[in-house]
């Protein structure tokens, strides 16, 4: 989803401008990953100068850390909200799962977290990835009250959702009945229809990427 930019000559309060830069960073890091992203690309997406980005965050590393941490913050906030007032374990899983699907329809959040969780080898970001993943686990288990096994199953389903949406399978589901069958096992009918509508807003896949692949 495109972020709103200020009109020419309009000045935003510092807090709003920071939010604007972090929203832009989420999109740029999501699309390009940490290595491919640049502070210049984030600056252009946010409608500010590169110098302003660096002055605000200090470095690309610091910007990435804050961006991914905020993505995890949003994820945890969604889980907490969905869990409020829910009593049965089955309803809890259903409500939080539905809320998560709606959240990661934002590809910036989805892909930024996916990039982070593949960086366990990274000198600086490896520990961050482990800490943020376990932060989610601890909220689900210790705060919301899910059992360790239920939490494991929920996280596994979440990672499957991440993979399916990251590959943009919902964009090409009409081309392959097996994809439709898989998606029907993962998402509700309402979720599938919603994701299909969102897929129409994506940059179209190249024709060669839309056909069915066979071995």
What kind of region is each of these model predictions?
Residues 123-134, 140-215:
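Hydrophobic/aromatic-rich alpha-helical bundle segments in the mid-to-C-terminal region
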Residues 91, 95, 99, 112-115, ...:
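Amphipathic alpha-helical interaction segments
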Residues 69-75:
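Short, basic, alpha-helical segments at the C-terminal edge of helix-turn-helix-like DNA-binding modules
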Residues 12-17:
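Short, Lys/Arg-enriched anionic-surface-contact patches
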Residues 20, 24-62, 66:
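Helix-turn-helix
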Residues 104-123:
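Amphipathic alpha-helical segments used for helix-helix packing
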Residues 66, 77-107, 203:
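Hydrophobic alpha-helical connector segments
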